[in-house]
Structure formats: C-alpha cells, structure tokens
C-alpha cells in the first residue's frame, strides 16, 4: 500500500512521453533551421537554379554555413529533377548530412516535393537512410503530415514498421500528431498496429490519449485491427488514457459491446479508467463508464487507498462529479480507505474549500481518522482531516472545520492539538500557511508594480493628508491633495497574519481600479506601492458624501427626479463593470459605496471586495463579501458560485432604500436580514409610494433565482424611461385607487425641509395620510384574499397587527400599507420579528 500523501501526479510513462515530445520538437526545429537561408544568399541560389548557364558554372563544393550542399539546396530553393540528376552524375553523394543531421531526401520529404523525392530515389538515394534522432524519411513524412510523400517512399521500398531512436514507428508518430491521411496510407501498406514503443505504448494508446477519434477508428477497424485491451509497461489500456484526458467520444466508442473492452482493468497503481477520469474531473466520462459498465469500479481501491469517490475529492474542482458519485448506491460519503482516510481528508489535503463545505453539509464526518502507513505497526499516528489541512497550510479550511466541529468524547491528540480534554486545535495561521501567505503577497506586489502603468505610481511624499473622512478594517480614509487635485486617500494597514490579508485586498483593488474609466465609477488617481507600511489608494474626492449619509444621517428629502438620477447613474456604472472584456463583480454594492456629487449625480465606489469574474481563485466566489444587509441570497448561503447577478440583487435593495428613505430591514440586525431574505424569501415592503414601473423592476431585481434578474442594461433603459416621464411616475398616477396629488405630498415634505425631527414629522404625516387614503383599497384587497379586516382600525392598531415598528432607530416610519409586506406575513405564519 502506498502513502496517499506521496502519490505522484505524473507516471513514469508521462515523463517518458514528455521527453519524446521534446525530442520531436527539437527535430522539427533543426529541420526548420536548415530551411533558413539568408535573403541575399537565397536570391543568388534562386538565380542559379533558375538559369542553366548559372547552374553549369557553380562550384560543386559550394556549402552554406549550415553545411547544406547543392543537392540539399536543390530541395530547398526551387530546384527540379534535372538538377538532381545533374548533381548526382557529377558525383555529389545523396547520403551527405547537413550539420543538423539530415540528408537531401529528408529535406525533400519535409518540403513535401514528391517529384524531387522520386528523382532522388531513382538517382540512388537510400530510402532507409537514418538521419538525426534515428529518423528515416518515412518518419519525417509522418511528423510533417505529408501523405503523398509517405506513399512515394513506401512505393520505393521504405520499411513501414521501421523504428526510430525512441522505438516509434511512422504509425506511432502519425497517431501521436493526429495525421489521419498519413495513418491511412501506412495502414494501406501493412503497418503493424500492435507494435510497441519504448514503454510498451502502441499507436492506439497514443491516439486515445491525444483524442484523435478518427485515427482510433482506423486503428481498430482497418488493417490487422489494434488490440483494444493492450497494456503498456504500466498496465495502462487505451481506455485509461482517453478516460484520463476526458475524450468522451473515444470512451463511448471503446465501450461498445462488440469491441469487448475490459472497463474495470487496473494499472500498476491500482487505478481503473474510472479512477483516472475522477482524478482529472472528467464528469461526462465518469458518468459514461458507470452507466455503461456498472458499479464494479466504484468499490475498487488503488494502492493509495482511494476509490473513485476519493479520486474525485482529490481533484476537488468538479462538485457535480462528486454529487453524481454520491448518488450511486455503492458510494458512502464516509467510506474509509485502507489507511483510514476519507474523501473529506483528500479534499482538505489539496485545499478544495468549496468541496470541503459541500461534503460537511452532506454528512461527511470530520472526526474520522487516517493512519500513516509508513509508520511501523506498533505505532499509531491518527490524523483527522483538520490535521491534514493544517499540515498543508490550508488555513481557511482549518477555520471552516473548526466552525463545523462536533465534539466527541475522544479525539486524537498530537502535536497539532492543545493539551487538555477539549481537543481544540492550535490557531491559524499554520506555519506553512503563514509562509504561503507571505510568499504569495510578495509575489502579488511585485507583479502589481510591474503591470501598473507608470502614471499611476505615486510616492507617499506626493500626497498631502488632511482630515479623516472614513475608516474600516483596512485602515482609514483621508481627504487630501495630490498632484494639484483634491483626493480621497485610502491608507492600508499591512497585515500578513490573517486569512484575508490587507495586502491581498490592496493588490486586488488597485488591479481593478487601474482598468476603470467611466463617469459613473469613481476615478482612480494612483497608488503607493513601495512598501506595505505605505500602501495607499488615491481616488477622486466626491464632495457630496455617501448615499447612506444623505438618507440616514442628514435625513435629506429628495424628490423623485433626483432619486431617479442617482439610480440611473449607479445602474450605468454597474452596467459598465459587467460589460467589460473581463467583467467585474462589485460584491459590496450598498448605499455606503454610492457617492454623490454636489449636483446630485452619483458614482460607484469602493472596490475592495470586487473580483474579475474570470478569476481562477476558486474560493473568491464562495466567501461572504460585503455588507450582509444588502447581500444576495446565493452569496449569503454560499451554496453556489455566484455571478454578476448578485450585484443586481444588491442594487435592487439600494433602489428600494433610495425610493423609500429607509434602511432595508432596519428592525433587524444585518445577519438576520440576510437570513430572512435567503431562507424565508422575505423582501422589503413595496408600498404605495413606489411607482408601479419601478416596483415591477424591484420584484425582478431581487428574484430568488439569479437567472430571473434583469441585466443592468435593461435596468438603465427602464429607469431612463421613468426619468423622462417623471411627472407620470408619481405614486398618484401609478395607482388607480384614491391617492395623493403629486403636489400635496411633495410640497408638504419640501416645505418642512428643516433639520431634525421636522423631517421625521413630515414623513410620519405622509405615511399616515397614505394610510388613510388607501384604507379602502386595502379593505377590498383583504376581502379578495379572504381576510376580514376592520375598516375602523387605527394606524397604531395596524402597526401592532403587523408586528412592524412605527419608527425605526433612525426616525423613519415603515410603510404599514405595503400589500407585499402584509401578504408575506399571511403566507408565512412562522415569520417573527427578530429585533
């Protein structure tokens, strides 16, 4: 039994084929080098071979610096068969090699000139002559993919099964490079399809590994018919190779019953074809093998104590494959290999955090232990999956496992455990995790310095700091001056000892900001990159502050037109981010990160949590970034890799907040608000004050299904249409029942535009008036749904019946007449105010 932790990712045959590939690449390079002739020399040679007089006067001892004789040059520079005959009659030997090791016949074959090939052979050239690498002219034809040249050589007696220095026949080479026509020619002349190369590899092995389906069919169906169960020196059959490299069409073809392929055969490492498909995340191939051949391979363990399920967990990047395997009756999520390790151990060891979370959510037991098979039988070194993750420095997984930990009476205790009976583990970062983090961050900074355009490089001495205007976990934000501009300076604290370091966040934000250029996105001025202690991001200063401050701290009252201008600007900024060549997902869109100019226009800011959508860092799209209160359900639940549609959800909450002047779910803490939206499908109430065209946009925007949400291009179009018809967008015109006139509502509010409680009083009056005017509509609606309401209820009684606070901590009145809110309470009897 082998040690799982020492399982090689490459086999011996892989290493050999790598060297073979390199050797053929060198051969092609040397052939091409022989064709490289200086321009002036080439023109002179073209003149020689184009004029009988010039040809007759040339010296037979002529040589280029690469050792090409006139006979070689005749094959390269446009000579003809008469030149070949004349030169050979004058005594030039066709066997003479260039400095790169090739005779004239090899060059004629590489140039694909059947006429010159025939002339050379008729004039005495040896068809079996070997050049560099043990290659004959037929090998060269197979490498270059020239079927006519190959046929001429074979007609003149070339050995179809001749082997080169690595024991490859021309058929091996044609199968390796995918030259279908050359393969057909070789088979027509009787090539042996079952001859073995240096490591026992046959043409069918090579074509199966490379995915050349038509060549596989030729080898199996024509000529002497290839052995579909032939094994190489490591006992691989063709099915192993096509399963490993994901060639589904070849797998399906080989599994045909009439071919009698053995689907459960193992190699010297104990791997079945299903193992190799799972080790490489080839879901469709694995599915085909299981569905066609049954479950026998599912229970087989290789020498590293891994079943196919373990193998899929080792790969770890295809959760659909893992789900499929778990759906099979023969697979148990907690199955332990001979050394005791489970699929969860494998996922932890290789750092697949998304898969680890999936396995834990589906019943994987993190307390099962594995034993080190390299230890003597008298010693025990039991290790949980947490220890495996800690050993490899996967600190994020260690933290996740601690969160899921279920205490038991006895847990293994070793160097990774704290003394004591609780089995608690040492805190992260692990030693290796710390080294990984520091190394990665240094590399990220160096790469950023190299890639950031010089105009964005700033020195800290260029920046003049004024007052503090904000702060966060990263550090502080200052107002200041840089290059004669008033700017905002985001000063980072360097901290390399946390799983989500400030250095990493800084590098990501700068790499995104430097690529943005749009009037609705905050403008990037530059960054200080010299030293982590001086890291700073400089952007334009937006004097109006944040939308959150405007609505909830200053308690400013905006008319509908002003609100729509802000909404359109933010939507345009987000549309720009999502439509870039490399789309950017903001991941933290909320009213804090919407900044306002003095003229009422808005920009999107703060890209500390943003990511390029094509990022390969697999855990980027599974963490919970940003503010929970504005977070999309799929982000909060971490159940899937979310997309740009998560930004649409956050935007919809911001739009509702802008229109109502309320914080979403102000009566709940942020985590409770996110949980209600994710698990109970609760949404903020869409009251009478929100025009119908916008309310329909809100409902689509915070759809629980991301695919049901609109693109920002559609949002911009709808809101611009509303803005053009703002007079018709008032609450009065969007509801057919009794309503406020546009002037009576807005004039009342604007006339009480003083600071403090006058705003709150105005809002209270507004909602009370809306309640009174809309009572008849509510009574009619309640009767239609079977609810008998008392038309004489007071506003206070209505508030009590809906369990909704009249005034929140910011002094805002929640809309008691929201039909959506009332309906959601009736549909969900378990909903409780968790304030």
Swiss-Prot record:
Gene Ontology CC entries for this record: cytoplasm; nucleus
Lipidated positions per record (N-myristoyl glycine): 2
Chain positions of ANK repeats: 66-96, 100-129, 133-162, 166-195, 199-228, 234-263, 269-298, 304-335, 339-368, 381-410
Gene: Tnni3k
Subunit structure: Interacts with TNNI3, ACTC, ACTA1, MYBPC3, AIP, FABP3 and HADHB.
Membrane-spanning segments: none
Coiled-coil annotated spans: 21-50
Catalytic activity: L-seryl-[protein] + ATP = O-phospho-L-seryl-[protein] + ADP + H(+); L-threonyl-[protein] + ATP = O-phospho-L-threonyl-[protein] + ADP + H(+)
Organism of derivation: Rattus norvegicus (Rat)
Modification after translation, per record: Autophosphorylated.
Highest taxon in the source lineage: Eukaryota
Ion transport in keyword set: no
Cofactor: Mg(2+)
Family assignment from sequence similarity: Belongs to the protein kinase superfamily. TKL Ser/Thr protein kinase family. MAP kinase kinase kinase subfamily.
Pfam families: Ank, Ank_2, PK_Tyr_Ser-Thr
Single Gene Ontology BP annotation: regulation of cardiac muscle contraction
Residues given in the record as ATP binding sites: 469-477, 490
Free-text function comment from the UniProt entry: May play a role in cardiac physiology.
GO MF entry, a single one: protein serine kinase activity
Keywords linked to the UniProt accession: ANK repeat, ATP-binding, Coiled coil, Cytoplasm, Kinase, Lipoprotein, Magnesium, Metal-binding, Myristate, Nucleotide-binding, Nucleus, Phosphoprotein, Repeat, Serine/threonine-protein kinase, Transferase
EC number in record: 2.7.11.1
Active-site residues, as the UniProt record annotates them: 588 (proton acceptor)
Taxonomy of the source species: Eukaryota, Metazoa, Chordata, Craniata, Vertebrata
Protein name: Serine/threonine-protein kinase TNNI3K
Localization in the cell: Nucleus; Cytoplasm
Major location (coarse): nucleus
